[in-house]
Design a protein with these regions (language model features):
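Extracytoplasmic low-complexity repetitive segments enriched in small/polar residues
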Residues: 47, 62-63, 75-76, 94, ...
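Loop/turn elements at helix/coil->beta-strand transitions in domains of secreted/extracellular proteins
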Residues: 21-25, 60-65, 95-101, 128-132
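Active-site segments of SGNH/GDSL-like serine hydrolases
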Residues: 66-72, 90-119
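Conserved SGNH/GDSL esterase-like catalytic core that processes O-acyl groups on lipids
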Residues: 1-85, 109-115
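Solvent-exposed, polar/charged alpha-helical surfaces in well-ordered, non-transmembrane soluble domains
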Residues: 8, 12, 16-19, 85-92, ...
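Active-site cleft segment of glycoside hydrolase catalytic domains centered on the general acid/base Glu
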Residues: 77-87, 148-150, 155
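Catalytic His-Asp segment of secreted/periplasmic serine-dependent ester chemistry enzymes
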Residues: 108-180
Length: 180
């Protein structure tokens, strides 16, 4: 799994949940402030595409890819087409036949941008076989959910569980039959 600070904060819970569901090896790589395709070596930030390139070159390749990026890209790009290009660039690094789950984005301070990004994500993944979108946005947008800390981005303890469940649910749709 490749993600940002949300993923980093949920790493233990995601790993435990996926392990309990039968995966023998779960690797979660989350980093604060990570963006899809923009890194900053001076600050030690590695872009998601760089991590994906490294993972794609490793052997064995992952049975299932999970991407949870976009939070730090929300509000930066001009329109849905720009977000679609960004997402397609990330996907170009991943094997086209590999199962892939992408967890969509929610930021209280960038709701409209998240909606645009998430529509682009849905559109791009609808064209890719063996893909699923985990709907984190919907989880967070429910008024009664109370899953986020006061910053409106990062999950609180209850939100960490909900985020991990969102990941596991998206992966369950894709899990290779031989692993079930």
């Amino acid at each position: 799994m490749i993600g940002d600070s949300i993923t980093a904060g949920a790493q233990r819970t995601v790993t435990a949940l996926l392990s309990r569901s039968g995966f023998s090896s779960v690797i979660v790589n989350g980093q604060n402030s990570r963006r899809i395709d923009v890194g900053n070596r001076k600050r030690g930030l590695v872009a998601g595409t760089e991590v994906a390139s490294y993972v794609a070159a490793s052997h064995p390749s992952p049975l299932v890819w999970v991407i949870a990026l976009g939070t730090n890209d929300a509000g930066i790009y001009r329109d849905g087409a720009a977000y679609a290009d960004l997402i397609e660039h990330m996907l170009s690094v991943v094997q086209s036949t590999a199962p892939l789950a992408w967890i969509n984005t929610y930021r209280r301070d960038q709701l409209r941008s998240c909606e645009i990004l998430n529509v682009a994500l849905n559109d791009v993944l609808a064209k890719r076989r063996n893909s699923a979108v985990g709907n984190w946005f919907e989880q967070c947008a429910l008024p009664e959910s109370r899953l986020l800390s006061s910053d409106g981005v990062h999950p609180n303890p209850r939100g960490v569980l909900a985020f991990a469940d969102t990941v596991a649910s998206a992966v369950a749709v894709l899990r290779p039959r031989r692993e079930r």
